[in-house]
Design a protein with these regions (language model features):
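Surface-exposed extracytoplasmic segments
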Residues: 1-257
Length: 257
């Protein structure tokens, strides 16, 4: 299930804002930025979630950030991804947050912007395309919630280094006859990035300045990411699909880097 596949999870104190934690969850591996005509990315009818456990006295997660995505085709008359200011596979997201382990959710962002793939200068910069810069598209995709969380969802270069050819060639690593090669170089993943104030993650709402030490157990959190689908998919006679049933986890990744 590539669209629901967790690739990597990262969590660290933000180097530019020590009062926040940055969490990055990557999905949908091995994407070519110019990989038309399908342009794989975040899937519809999938719940992408980041789970946070900030209280060792209670089981399970305490905070959940849930992302769901929608796609529209602004110019269905063409197979081009972008043309004359219109974008196909245009993706937006809704962000919800639970602070009671998933019992209730509050909507933080609706209609969040997912930037398009950087498929080439004619499509991004040219007058027959979007007539802008990719830097501006990425900047416009940054969002801030009313509570101060910073959010980004979109395609990014896969930051991981792994010699996939060596790994799956009977564990040929380091390579016996050549240098290691980055198997994910110049390939994208679909990234969910959050920058969250520490007081929103600490169980009692304390800031980092209130920690007794770097090992203060009240400031230790557990983080994992998941993707879930509903159990029933119906292929309708007209060619459309409908979904129902319980939501079941189909991908999970912990032990953040």
């Amino acid at each position: 299930d590539p669209l629901a596949d967790n690739t990597d999870l990262y969590a660290f104190v933000s180097p530019d804002e020590p009062g926040t934690v940055t969490i990055i969850a990557a999905y949908v591996p091995m994407q070519l930025p110019h990989g038309g005509p399908n342009y794989f990315g975040f899937g519809e009818n999938i719940r992408y979630e980041i789970h946070i456990d900030n209280n060792i006295a209670t089981p399970g997660d305490d905070i959940i950030y849930r992302f769901t995505f929608k796609k529209v085709h602004e110019d269905p008359t063409t197979f081009f991804y972008i043309r004359l200011g219109a974008q196909n596979h245009k993706t937006t997201y809704t962000l919800e947050r639970s602070r009671d382990g998933g019992l209730t959710f509050t909507t933080l962002i609706e209609g969040g912007i997912v930037p398009p793939n950087n498929i080439g200068p004619r499509s991004i910069n040219g007058p027959a395309g979007l007539n802008t810069t990719y830097a501006e598209l990425m900047e416009n995709a940054l969002a801030t919630t009313a509570d101060g969380e910073r959010v980004f969802c979109g395609p990014t270069d896969d930051p991981f280094f792994v010699d996939l050819g060596g790994v799956f060639d009977l564990g040929d690593m380091p390579r016996q006859d050549s240098e290691p090669r980055d198997g994910v170089a110049c390939l994208n993943v679909s990234t969910i990035a959050l920058k969250i104030p520490i007081e929103w993650l600490q169980k009692d709402g304390k800031t980092e300045l209130e920690a007794s030490s770097i090992l203060d157990p009240d400031f230790v959190i557990g983080i994992w990411a998941s993707a879930s689908r509903q159990t029933i998919r119906t292929l309708n006679a007209a060619g459309s699909e409908s979904y129902g049933g319980d939501w079941i986890q189909v991908s999970r990744l912990g032990m953040p880097l």
